[in-house]
Amino acid sequence: MQEKAYKLLAVQENISHNEAKALIDAGLVSARGAKIALAREMLGENTKFSVMKPAKPTIIYEDENVLAVNKPPFMSSENLEKIYKFGLLNRLDKETSGVVLLYKNEEFREAAILEFKNLRVKKSYIAIVKGIVSEEMKFDEPILTIKTRSGAFSKISPNGKSAFSEVYPLMVSGKKSLVKVRIETGRTHQIRVHLANAGFGVIGDEKYAKSRAKRMFLHSYETEILGLKFKAPLGTSFNEFGFEIPKDL
């Protein structure tokens, strides 16, 4: 027999249906190594769930102008504004972890916005992708973003905005690769779209790579702006596929 995922989870965890739905919607529930995407997904009645505890953000740098935070996956960037009471300088997708910057005064905000507009902000990401990446790749492909009530969707299109990404192979484990991605532009879902279009979709990226995992393995590793460099350490989840990741990438 089958039943809706949230009802099965409610029984397993001895919680209400609404609490079970909230956990699934937050991306914290998996079964058989894959994240449960829909609370109403029909599953076998003997399905065993794993429920992740929501990680907390950590401060990686702070001075009188800026606060740099290592955002965990499954948390919206807007939540950081509520927690720390400062405004956002950049945003990450809910599923993406890593460096998020918050400004403390308008002077720094204006200076930072100018850096972003002039493409002077250096950003690098770490990702685990499908397939074996054996050499550097460069993508100079415009991205068009379509925004709907259900969220944003991006695609490569001649009608899109310029988008440039550089991909560097770091190591391989099985049929998966750990890569570093440097970007100059910051288009919506840029890295995910460029990698998926090249056949190296990010593991856990359900939208563009049709990949299900406990999380999306994309992490904003380092951001450099106005002479300051912020680095967010990788979480232990990146060791999941047999990668022995050094402290400094």
Where are these regions (language model features)?
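Short, well-structured beta-strand segments within conserved domains
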Residues: 47, 189-193
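Short beta-strand segments
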Residues: 137, 163-165, 189, 228-230
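Long C-terminal interaction/binding lobes of large macromolecular proteins
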Residues: 167, 179
